Amino acid sequence: MNPITFSVVLTSLASEQFLAVSSSHWLLAWMGLEINTLAIIPLMTQHKHPRAIEASTKYFLTQAAASALLLFSSLNNAWLTGEWSILDLTNPLSCATMTIAICMKLGLAPFHFWLPEVLQGLSLTTGLILSTWQKLAPMAILYQIAPMLNTPLLLTLGLTSTLIGGWGGLNQTQLRKILAFSSIAHLGWMISILPFSPQLMILNLTIYLIMTSTMFLVLKTISSTKISSLATSWSKTPSTTALSLLTLLSLGGLPPLSGFVPKWFIIQELTSQNTTILATTLALSALLSLFFYLRLTYIVTLTSSPNTSNASLTWRHHSKQPTLLLSIALILSSFIIPISPLTLT
């Protein structure tokens, strides 16, 4: 891609995200989301491959439908109440349609079918942007309108997402699809806690962004997109591979790693809100996700593929990829647990 075009696309991607997040008017928020969608499509199609074109088309159609529903919801609310403010979403129909529109943009179940297919057709770098940066604006809008939303609807969407996210990743062999279902499951945890404690949703979102970014950076460093190629990662970058298993276990929510902290707090909060059945179901659904994370960990650490004697020497050559960001991300995604007691006070 032309450097000038690339800089314009990245600037639009960043600025319109901030417009959508900081706006208090529905029309401006919708405009920010729309331009943000249009800005990422050139990044999706920069590799001229049929899968990339198909992924960008699916993404555009899904996001266009979600944006149309969001605009309908805000127009309906403005027609009935005379208010365009995001904080004045009072009509029940508008609240329900707005929730569905934002969940469709995020890829929450049962509106999740586009996410694994789109992510599979993208490069790891674009997939990283789609799985992290593109979640910020819809989550910020959800955070603002959380008090007005229908709690049973949110809990149903959250529980469905955690179950489908865990169940869908069990039989996958493509790493990008596994990360897509992982994203769906994590978003389900966030939506489930949103009606009770929006602050915990922000904590969960922050740790999810760190862990997912780390995993995408690791996969980009070792050039792996399939489970079968993970077994050769030891010969490429031994130290990165050793730390990546901690990231995988952290994504699975095992203590005392970073991913355990938000799940612990969420279950504690749900139990205190007398929703013990929901908390138990969420905890059991996390076992589904943990299974395929453990499978990836087993392949990375305890298996080795047949290779020549020269293959074991590739790590001796200096890598040309910058690793400072990856090093920081690996530490944050694995060892943020020492600061967790401070969040209890």
Curated annotation (Swiss-Prot):
Q: Name one GO biological process term.
A: mitochondrial electron transport, NADH to ubiquinone
Where does the source fall among the domains of life? Eukaryota
Which EC class, in a word?
translocase
The record's listing under InterPro entries reads: Complex_I_Subunit_2, NADH_DH_su2_C, NADH_UbQ_OxRdtase_chain2, ND/Mrp_TM
TM region positions: 25-45, 60-80, 99-119, 149-171, 178-198, 199-219, 242-262, 282-302, 324-344
Q: What does this protein do?
A: Core subunit of the mitochondrial membrane respiratory chain NADH dehydrogenase (Complex I) which catalyzes electron transfer from NADH through the respiratory chain, using ubiquinone as an electron acceptor. Essential for the catalytic activity and assembly of complex I.
Its recorded name reads NADH-ubiquinone oxidoreductase chain 2
| UniProt gene name | mt-nd2
